């Protein structure tokens, strides 16, 4: 029942974002739209931004599913772009109402989930310290998130496939090369 309520709250927030900016939406608005009381909202989330973050993480889980290997990372990243695009009014509203850093905070778990699995696979039989793997993941995460934030800022006009294809061409082989440099 808890997941059902959370999904209903998420849908209410997304409905409200079609009508007004995030900064003008209250917990009461969401509760009214959802047909629950405010305390039920607070049972599940500490504030609206907590709901936004949860929504982004849930979208990431659905988008990535099993697309977290070296062979499928492009498909996984494309699915993140597509999930963001499917929620365009929601994402653009959040992007315009909060600082870029906040949107980055929402995107980071999506991208990190993808990258860490890919890096673990690429590291294969290599002995590499965990903090070095994390560092490599962080560098790629900045690239991926930076591209996505610029795409969002530009109103998601460019075809995500082109972005992912160009990125794949540019970084092909670089992750394995970076990991080799950290090999013990």
Place the predicted regions along the sequence by residue.
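Residues in the helix-turn-helix
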Residues: 40, 90
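C-terminal peripheral helix-coil segments that are non-catalytic and often amphipathic
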Residues: 150-184
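Amphipathic alpha-helical packing segments from all-alpha helical-bundle domains
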Residues: 100-125, 131-146, 176
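Short, hydrophobic secondary-structure boundary micro-motifs
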Residues: 25-26, 92-94, 103, 160
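An amphipathic alpha-helix adjacent to DNA-recognition modules
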Residues: 3-6, 10-14, 18, 23-27, ...
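Amphipathic alpha-helical segments that line or abut small-molecule/effector binding pockets
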Residues: 74-89, 138, 142, 146, ...
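Secondary-structure edge/capping motif, primarily at the C-terminal ends of alpha-helices
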Residues: 67, 91-95, 122-125, 151-155, ...
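Protein-protein interaction and targeting regions used for scaffolding, dimerization, and localization
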Residues: 116-117, 127-135, 153, 160-163, ...
């Amino acid at each position: 029942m808890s997941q059902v309520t959370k999904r209903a709250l998420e849908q209410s927030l997304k409905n409200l974002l079609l009508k007004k900016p995030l900064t003008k939406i209250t917990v009461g608005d969401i509760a009214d739209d959802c047909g629950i009381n405010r305390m039920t909202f607070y049972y599940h989330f500490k504030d609206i931004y907590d709901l936004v973050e949860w929504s982004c993480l849930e979208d990431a889980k659905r988008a990535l599913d099993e697309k977290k290997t070296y062979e499928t990372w492009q498909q996984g990243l494309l699915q993140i772009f597509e999930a963001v695009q499917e929620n365009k009014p929601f994402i653009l509203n959040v992007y315009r109402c909060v600082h870029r850093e906040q949107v980055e905070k929402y995107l980071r778990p999506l991208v990190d989930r993808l990258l860490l699995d890919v890096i673990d696979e690429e590291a294969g039989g290599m002995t590499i310290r965990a903090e070095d793997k994390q560092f490599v993941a962080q560098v790629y995460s900045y690239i991926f998130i930076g591209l996505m934030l610029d795409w969002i800022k530009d109103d998601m006009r460019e075809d995500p496939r082109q972005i992912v294809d160009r990125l794949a061409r540019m970084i092909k082989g670089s992750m394995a090369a970076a990991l080799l440099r950290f090999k013990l």
